[in-house]
Amino acid sequence: MTEFEIRCEHKPSPAKLEVLQVDHWPVWKKEISRFPWHYDQTETCYVLRGRFVVTPEGGEPREFGRGDLISFPAGLACTWEILEPVEKHYRLD
């Protein structure tokens, strides 16, 4: 287990998404690919479409997809593997 915990809530309520103002967050899109990533800031994202696996350095792979509200902590180093084209709203804290 790594010291950086990825948190995920599957299919949060529409009320929660409204309170977070997810619809006003920028959108990120990416085609099928694999790449290393380091989070300099905490990122919260809501997946609109697609499927991907994130493997933290020294940790176990986790799969995410449509309807997931995910928080990636600042300092996390990982590898992204996009299995189906991804579209997500995101916010950096």
Please state what every model-predicted region is:
Residues A74-D93:
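Ligand-binding loop in jelly-roll beta-barrel domains
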Residues K11, Q21-D40, P73-A74:
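Conserved short histidine dyad/triad with adjacent acidic residue
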Residues T2-C8, H24-V27, E87-D93:
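Double-stranded beta-helix
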Residues E18, F35-Y39, P56, R62-E63, ...:
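Short histidine-centered beta-strand/loop micro-motifs
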Residues W37, V54, K88-Y90:
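Short hydrophobic/aromatic-rich beta-strand segments that constitute the beta-sheet cores
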Residues M1-V19:
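Transition segment at domain starts
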Residues Y39-V54:
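Short, conserved beta-strand element in jelly-roll/cupin
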Residues G58-A74:
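Short acidic-glycine-tyrosine-enriched beta hairpin
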